[in-house]
């Protein structure tokens, strides 16, 4: 996916964190390609937020895809990340002690997706995810993030 689309979807995600409830702790710069050098933090999730009321931190990795496609198994789905990236997100979660969530936008535009899915990293062990599986994590488009039983919703 191209760089500009990714940034537009990250901006969409940031707008869902209402300032009265959420503090933005970090936004990944993703500048490795620009400086032609590896930057360790570029492999971290895109956004780190803290809930102001509960003082709980969450990391969010944003992935936009234009559509689902038919996979080798004959089911509609998408590849949300490469395996090595999933390992990096798992390591980040383990080392930092707070959960990583994956926000996937599908269809429409990166700034206004048709559908959105919010999935705990622990529920996405593989790079391929079927549409059927993702449906249980579907959230309303443009609905602000909230905390529910200490989970990001």
Language model region names:
Residues 3, 37, 75-79:
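Short, surface-exposed loop/turn motifs that are enriched in glycine and acidic residues
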Residues 14, 86-93:
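Short amphipathic alpha-helical segments and helix-helix/interface helices
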Residues 65-89:
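Mg2+/Mn2+-dependent nuclease catalytic core
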Residues 26-57:
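Active-site metal-binding core of divalent-cation-utilizing nuclease and nuclease-like domains
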Residues 5-13, 85:
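Conserved alpha-helical elements of sugar-nucleotide-dependent glycosyltransferases
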Residues 32, 55, 67, 108-110:
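Surface-exposed, flexible loop/turn segments at secondary-structure boundaries
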Residues 17, 45-71:
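Conserved catalytic cores of phosphodiester-cleaving nucleases, focusing on short active-site segments
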